[in-house]
Amino acid sequence: MDSYSIIIKPHVTEKTMNLIDKNNEITFVVKRDANKGQIKRAFEELYEEKVARVTTHITPRGNKVAFIKLVEEEMAEELAVKIGVF
């Protein structure tokens, strides 16, 4: 799968904004059939940042959301500004 087809868009809510500040995690809506390894590789390829872990869940609306924890502190906030979340 292509990296651009795996990661669809940032998932922005009040909760995800708090995760950026407190847990160094950023969230994205991803392709439903993508697994954690594919999501990690796609994120590292697109944004050139190291990933510590990926957790996922499927929302009641049927969207798959990936919570991506970054290795370096403060990188999630900088990345969010870079991609236009803030």
Curated annotation (Swiss-Prot):
Q: Please name one Pfam family that this protein belongs to.
A: Ribosomal_L23
Keywords assigned by UniProt, alphabetized: Ribonucleoprotein, Ribosomal protein, RNA-binding, rRNA-binding
Query: Key word Nucleotide-binding present in the record?
Result: no
**GO CC terms:** ribonucleoprotein complex; ribosome
Name the InterPro entries for this protein: Nucleotide-bd_a/b_plait_sf, Ribosomal_uL23, Ribosomal_uL23-like, Ribosomal_uL23/eL15/eS24_sf
What is one process in the GO biological process aspect for this record? Answer: translation
Task: Cite the GO molecular-function annotations of the record.
Answer: rRNA binding; structural constituent of ribosome
Q: Which residues form the signal peptide?
A: none
Task: Relate the protein's function as given in its record.
Answer: Binds to 23S rRNA. One of the proteins that surrounds the polypeptide exit tunnel on the outside of the ribosome.
Record's subunit section = Part of the 50S ribosomal subunit. Contacts protein L29.
- Family the UniProt entry places it in: Belongs to the universal ribosomal protein uL23 family.
Name of the protein this chain belongs to? Large ribosomal subunit protein uL23
Origin species? Methanobrevibacter smithii (strain ATCC 35061 / DSM 861 / OCM 144 / PS)
